[in-house]
From Swiss-Prot:
Protein's cellular compartments: Cytoplasm
Reaction catalysed by this enzyme: N-terminal L-glutamyl-[protein] + L-leucyl-tRNA(Leu) = N-terminal L-leucyl-L-glutamyl-[protein] + tRNA(Leu) + H(+); N-terminal L-aspartyl-[protein] + L-leucyl-tRNA(Leu) = N-terminal L-leucyl-L-aspartyl-[protein] + tRNA(Leu) + H(+)
Physiological role: Functions in the N-end rule pathway of protein degradation where it conjugates Leu from its aminoacyl-tRNA to the N-termini of proteins containing an N-terminal aspartate or glutamate.
Protein name as annotated: Aspartate/glutamate leucyltransferase
Membership in a protein family: Belongs to the R-transferase family. Bpt subfamily.
NCBIfam families attached to this UniProt entry: PRK01305.1-1 (NF002341), PRK01305.1-3 (NF002342), PRK01305.2-3 (NF002346)
A GO CC annotation given for this chain: cytoplasm
Short name of one Pfam family: ATE_C
Top-level EC class: transferase
GO molecular function: arginyl-tRNA--protein transferase activity; leucyl-tRNA--protein transferase activity
Length: 262
């Protein structure tokens, strides 16, 4: 029998979900294509799936498979060519003192409390603000690939030394990092934690000598997803080809909310 890491993508099966309400574009229905079985999707296979436009939620690996909509566009930053704009430089300057700790995916009560606070203030009524501990763990702490949790805290000597400000989940691929999900303290007015988190991940990707930071799906008509076009140069996947893309919103310099990767 072949070693697990040698199994080709042809060993996987793909099925389409039933239609469900789209969480990004109001009034639309969505479907996903899910890769199975989950136990065959190791780090190598998952890297190849991400390059084909897939993401994961817990142990479920999926990509958009909608009947009449193609709004969700896989995107990735070319980290070696990335240069921050003025607002991104300001976000870096404001938050570079945060202490980052990279750890395995582990349940921490403090993280869960921040997650609920973030959901209640940023996505109230969406259902995730009522997530149980089990739902939180299934969503963010279950993975069969090379995943990490990163927590950001106020540094020693600061007025709130040790205070948790942000938690981010990332996957390590063979050609880059993939941002899974980020949540942060929503009570700090004027903070740019989400922007800083992406900048931090870009730097980490560079330090690993890898070319890409995958940001999930860019959706032009979704305000909470359109921000991704601010990180240039951005590549998008169309058909089976990645190509450089500059979104109209980014080109016009329109402001966007601080990101939270989803």
């Amino acid at each position: 029998m072949s070693k697990l890491k040698e199994l080709p993508l042809s060993a996987l099966q793909f099925y389409a979900t039933a239609p469900y309400a789209c969480s990004y574009l109001e009034g639309r229905m969505a479907r996903s294509q899910v890769a199975t079985p989950a136990h065959l999707i190791n780090a190598d296979v998952y890297s190849r799936l991400v390059r084909a436009g897939f993401r994961r939620s817990g142990i479920f690996t999926y990509r958009p498979y909608c009947d009449e909509c193609r709004a969700c566009t896989p995107c990735r930053v070319l980290v070696d060519q990335f240069r921050p704009d003025r607002s991104q430089r300001r976000a870096w300057r404001d938050h570079q003192g945060l202490q980052a700790l990279v750890a395995p995916l582990t349940y921490v009560e403090e993280h869960y409390a921040l997650y609920l606070l973030y959901q209640s203030m940023r996505h109230a009524g969406g259902g995730m603000d009522q997530d149980s501990r089990d739902q939180y763990e299934q969503f963010l702490l279950q993975s069969r690939v090379n995943s990490r949790l990163v927590e950001f805290r106020e540094p020693p000597g600061s007025p709130e030394a040790g205070r948790l400000r942000m938690v981010s989940m990332i996957d390590v691929l063979d050609d880059g990092l993939s941002s899974v999900y980020t949540f942060y303290d929503p009570l700090i007015v004027g903070a740019s934690y989400g922007t800083y988190n992406i900048l931090w991940q870009i730097n980490q990707t560079r330090e690993l000598g890898l070319p890409h930071l995958y940001l999930g799906y860019w959706i032009a008509d979704s305000r909470k997803m359109a921000y991704k076009a601010r990180f240039q140069p951005l590549q998008v996947l169309t058909g089976n080809q990645w190509h450089t893309f500059k979104a109209p919103a980014e080109a016009s310099g329109q402001p966007a909310p601080d990101p939270a990767l989803e």
